[in-house]
Amino acid sequence: MKSYPIILIVLIIFFGLSSCISIKKYNEQRTTCISPDQMKEDVDFSYSKLKEMHPQLYWYISKEELDFKFDSLKRTIKEPLTPIQFYFKLQPVITSIREGHLALRIPRKKFTKKEIKALEHKKGIFSRFEYYIKDDHLYIIKNNDSIENIKPGTEILSINDIPVSEYIKKYKKLINSDGLNTTFQPYFLKDVFFNFYTAEYGVNEKATIKTLYDHEKKIYTLKREAKSEEDLKKDKAQEKRTAERKINDYVPLSDSYNRSFKFLDSDKTIAYIKVKSFSQDYSSTFYKETFSKIKTANSSYLIIDIRNNYGGSLYEINNLYSYLTSEPFSLIKPSQVTSISTPLKTNYFRKSNPFQYIFKSLLYPTYFFAQSFSTYKKDGSVYYKMRADKPTKPNKDAFQGKIFVLINGGSFSASSIITAKLKHDKRVVLIGEETGGANDGTVAGFYSYQKLPHSKINLPIGLLLVKPNIQFSNTKRGVIPDIAITESMQDIIENKDPQLDWVINEIEGEKKAKQFPPTSKDL
């Protein structure tokens, strides 16, 4: 019995060393050039896997056009490239499919646990700012640490002597929304800009930026500073999972909550729910408690804010919808897959350490049995069984008043699914911008993670065609708001919210009209 701890220690050391060797091998491969023939094989592999598993590959691009793009790409590959250089050639072709969920994973450098711990004890260079992108311009809109006293509204003209416009033009080609709308790209690009940058240039200790503010140009050298003891204590405190943090889905990285609720007036007639991500974690408890409070307060108006919400759980939006309707409903149509074997292509053992691999192996027969009976055929197509396409009853605390929903280009995936359904059922007034996700559905659900044979780049392929249960618009666009109101950079800097302000003013106008109805003389 006493030998078990020793064996366990030996195994931990063994697997730790194996992990370090694996990381070293990966990083070496990442900087090693691949031959043109090998890259062309990776191109063919990518396209063949997309045709095999993607259930709506030619939704926004014809087969002839996509064939041409892949063939043209292969003709441009004439010299050896590193995996990351190859990524910047292949990803724009993947982007042309115009499916926002479909993207190669950029081959970033991997770090050992020791290196990760060292980085955790330092502040980031670029992550301490918040950004805004318009056209080919990048602006700082928030400087929480007052670094170099850089003012909100400052434009970054160059990074390490390379114009920012060049980065933006290059990185724009790597991302896309669902379909033909253009609202998603600036929202998503501002969030991933420095992910692309650090993948391309590494995690460095300093960077030089040239800026423009109020017609004055300045040069700053940003450095990766060590965190103070107070910073480290704050990091540790943020990791604690209190009951409130669980229910509101606390995010330590941003020191904020994914879900929040409040009344916007003293008499509690206006309820406000903000959801930054449909993460599902403790969401049932959140909505149960929230709508109980709204019902008790007898609120007349509800505002749901899903701006900058990139989506998430179908279960959560199905549950949320049950609080917004008085009739039984089916949120989505049956979800199509390419074949009955598709559910078994989801990389069951992906990212499993040796211990998890052993545990999952024991459970695999159950998983295999469940997935094997998870599909059915109808009218010549194959569908995956989903709870969200079954009839759902309205919740007993369902809101019966007037509902406003705030949307913008950052409303994507599940946010667009629920928005499209609410608009179709005439349950809400939509305020803001066209959503970044498509009105008529998307391809996501769960993924098959394919690794390209030579470059080792990962290609996650969505396996489910998920469509809201509506009459489709067939416009290849996002969900269009009833009232179009945009938010400027200056609005954000000054903490103004023209979209929410419009709703509040509309509600106040309705309240006054009810309080002082027009008399026969007025008419």
Identify what each model region corresponds to.
Residues 1-27:
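Bacterial Sec-dependent N-terminal signal peptides
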Residues 6, 392, 518-519:
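Generic low-complexity segments that are intrinsically disordered, proline-rich and/or Lys/Arg-biased
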Residues 12-15, 106, 426, 504:
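Generic low-complexity, intrinsically disordered sequence content enriched
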Residues 19-302, 306-337, 348-349, 439-451, ...:
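Flexible, low-complexity junctional segments that flank or bridge functional domains
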Residues 154, 296, 314-492, 506:
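Conserved acidic, small-residue-rich alpha-beta core segments centered on
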